[in-house]
Amino acid sequence: MVVKIGILKCGNIGMSPVVDLCLDERADRNDIDVRVLGSGAKMGPEQVEEVAKKMVEEVKPDFIVYIGPNPAAPGPKKAREILSAGGIPTVIIGDAPGIKDKDAMAEEGLGYVLIKCDPMIGARRQFLDPVEMAMFNADVIRVLAGTGALRVVQNAIDDMVFAVEEGKEIPLPKIVITEQKAVDAMDFANPYAKAKAMAAFVMAEKVADIDVKGCFMTKEMEKYIPIVASAHEAIRYAAKLVDEARELEKATDAVSRKPHAGEGKILNKCKLMAKPE
């Protein structure tokens, strides 16, 4: 059986570029077929409505993954309205601002995975250009991967896939990813590696607070430019911490790897030269 997954990308968070790729990391999985629709960097109600309706009415997947910033914003709320009424099981993946709407999403019949370490970018024209944007997102992706947050997202979607394959009701996740949930998913062998990953997660959370201050709460240019710059410096060091954590695991040949088998099963290994089982 091939499970058809529909992914809606509206706007961008750190998890957006890899949410589909983490389900099929070698492009050799034969039990899923993924279709991705998106509205680019924008997530206004008009853009979101167009792609959400197309996903529900034309693509008609077995389930839908919607991903983007702040699920409580007007555009994502419009998507939630369409997806809730569409009759297709749907999970909303978002960042920390969505936590305040998690009960509303549950009432709408939607699942959610809200990632506290996926921070807002320093979106000030005087600071953010395409290069800075790309480097920030690269650092965030390293934090998501190295702390275990990415693995929590991947496992939640895989559980939905497996339910379809087994003919069971699709479980709609209701997850807020904290530092503890993230590092638990990584199966760290070295407690210092785990501690470094937890520190990186908390630093990334703080980056969001700093960027909110710089983007929305500070009006003077000479004040908000160094504020958002400091947030980007912080995420760079959070990414370094997860690199340090992984190097500690490498030193004792204890890196947790969980690749997908061709038929979709999640395999497991720790020793570099061992076969995944």
Curated annotation (Swiss-Prot):
Biological function:
Catalyzes the reversible reduction of methenyl-H(4)MPT(+) to methylene-H(4)MPT.
Q: Which Pfam families match?
A: MTD
Q: What is its EC number?
A: 1.5.98.1
Q: Single Gene Ontology BP term? A: one-carbon metabolic process
Key word Oxidoreductase present in the record? yes
Going by the UniProt record, its keywords in alphabetical order are: Methanogenesis, One-carbon metabolism, Oxidoreductase
Can you name this protein? F420-dependent methylenetetrahydromethanopterin dehydrogenase
| HAMAP family for this protein | MTD (MF_00058)
Family, as annotated: Belongs to the MTD family.
**Single GO molecular-function term?**
ferredoxin hydrogenase activity
- Name its pathway: One-carbon metabolism; methanogenesis from CO(2); 5,10-methylene-5,6,7,8-tetrahydromethanopterin from 5,10-methenyl-5,6,7,8-tetrahydromethanopterin (coenzyme F420 route): step 1/1
Known catalytic reactions: 5,10-methylenetetrahydromethanopterin + oxidized coenzyme F420-(gamma-L-Glu)(n) + 2 H(+) = 5,10-methenyl-5,6,7,8-tetrahydromethanopterin + reduced coenzyme F420-(gamma-L-Glu)(n)
InterPro entries annotated for this entry? MTD, MTD_sf
